[in-house]
């Protein structure tokens, strides 16, 4: 059954994007014309729907607590732990609206997905290239400065250790919050890895818990940890 769910996940993942290709093109034309309202309307409708569909076909239930802690009057930087491929659709489905993500460059090579991610405001980073990483962080900073929230995985890659653990946080990711003065919203994803990677990359039903907290770190306080 887990094999069938995994196959269904990939069929749905790309099938949705193929079936809605016309909508993707409409959003891209709107972006080229500077019609940000249309782009936002399309992104806010389809990306959460696509993400929820991935969870549904794989039998994953999402339990989110603390959405009331997200600031409503200003952009923020969501800081999430990273343990599973599920993490991105979980955040896109679970937060109050989808936000751009600091994502690894490999995702930019996936057809259709890369175009939706660019519309969302994702920034792709070459983790082994210092200059490219700095440019990516500057691009992400500009997005927050424009009034849009952003998601970062400060570990820089998926942590493969025991549940509840975390990898080493990369200081550079926090500079987005430092430079913009945006509040940091920690997001803890629990249980995702056990439903896929720990099962030999086979989709397994279960529940993922995502508590959302809030902290407003002032720039000089954050710099002490960089």
What are these model-derived regions, one by one?
Residues 51, 122-126, 157-158:
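Short, basic, glycine/proline-bearing loop/turn elements
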Residues 215-224:
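Conserved small/polar residues in nucleotide/adenosyl-binding loops
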Residues 125, 187, 212:
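Hydrophobic residues at beta-strand termini and immediately following loops
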Residues 130, 134-202, 209:
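Membrane-associated lipid acylation/remodeling enzymes share a hydrophobic transmembrane-juxtamembrane segment
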Residues 20-33, 40-44, 56-58, 72-130:
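Catalytic core of membrane glycerolipid acyltransferases/transacylases, capturing the structured
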Residues 207-214:
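Acyl/amide activation-and-transfer machinery of modular secondary-metabolite enzymes
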Residues 1-33, 37-41, 45, 62-72, ...:
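Membrane-interfacial terminal anchoring regions of lipid-handling membrane enzymes
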């Amino acid at each position: 059954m887990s094999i069938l769910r995994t196959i269904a996940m990939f069929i749905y993942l790309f099938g949705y994007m193929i079936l809605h290709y016309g909508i993707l093109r409409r959003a891209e034309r709107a972006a080229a014309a500077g019609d940000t309202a249309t782009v936002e309307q399309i992104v806010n409708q389809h990306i959460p729907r696509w993400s929820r569909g991935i969870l549904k076909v794989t039998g994953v239930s999402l339990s989110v607590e603390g959405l009331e802690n997200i600031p409503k009057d200003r952009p923020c930087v969501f800081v999430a732990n990273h343990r599973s491929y599920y993490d991105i659709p979980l955040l896109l489905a679970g937060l109050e609206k989808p936000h751009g993500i600091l994502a690894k460059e490999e995702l930019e090579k996936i057809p259709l997905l890369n175009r939706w991610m660019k519309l969302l405001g994702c920034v792709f980073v070459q983790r082994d290239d210092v200059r490219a990483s700095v440019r990516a962080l500057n691009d992400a900073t500009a997005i927050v400065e424009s009034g849009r929230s952003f998601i970062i995985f400060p570990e820089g890659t998926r942590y493969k250790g025991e549940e509840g653990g975390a990898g080493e946080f990369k200081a550079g990711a926090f500079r987005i919050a430092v430079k913009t003065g945006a509040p940091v919203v920690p997001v803890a994803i629990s249980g995702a890895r056990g439903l896929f990677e720990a099962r030999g990359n086979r989709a397994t039903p279960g529940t993922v818990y995502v508590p959302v907290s809030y902290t407003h770190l002032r720039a000089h306080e954050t710099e002490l940890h960089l």
